[in-house]
Amino acid sequence: MPKLCILSNSHGFIHPEVVKIANQCDIAIHAGDIINESTLSQLKPKQKLIAIQGNNDDHISSLNKIEFLEFPSGKIAIEHGHLHGHQKPSHESLRSAYPDAKVIIYGHTHKQVIDKESTPWVINPGASGEIRNHGGSKCFTMGIYDDKEWLITPYVFIS
């Protein structure tokens, strides 16, 4: 069972508790707006770090705008989300872009969202840093147990 830490919108700072969770997971996923690439060096998951460009990361040319992660029980699509609606990315637009995914991860809004109303699920971990974190730095963990159970757990840390 792989365990993932999902974060976004760090804007140069990741809350220490989010770093701690990421480093205890097998895979860490950062859904963009990193701002300072050295921020990623704090993240040392057991197996793999995946990070994508956000709308403020054009200067980090080593990162892709979209990434995919595949498991026997489904695929995860990762993008920042800003191209699907600037103020509030459209979940229907994201679902149309990645119809074969089980989960779509996006960032951009700084707001934590778990939308399981239809497949693929659309999730946003919220802001992991201090800027516009709407009541605390946030992240998700996701445990992939088998074909039927993918468990998402939200975290909020008040500084």
Residue ranges and their predicted role:
Residues 37, 67-70, 79, 117, ...:
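Glutamate identity and glutamate-enriched acidic tracts
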Residues 12, 36, 83, 111, ...:
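Short active-site segment of divalent metal-dependent hydrolases/proteases
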Residues 6-8, 28-33, 50-55, 78-80, ...:
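Active-site neighborhood of phospho(di)ester-bond hydrolases with catalytic His/Asp-centered motifs
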Residues 1-47, 57-66, 71-73, 138-141, ...:
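N-terminal active-site segment of His-dependent metallophosphoesterases
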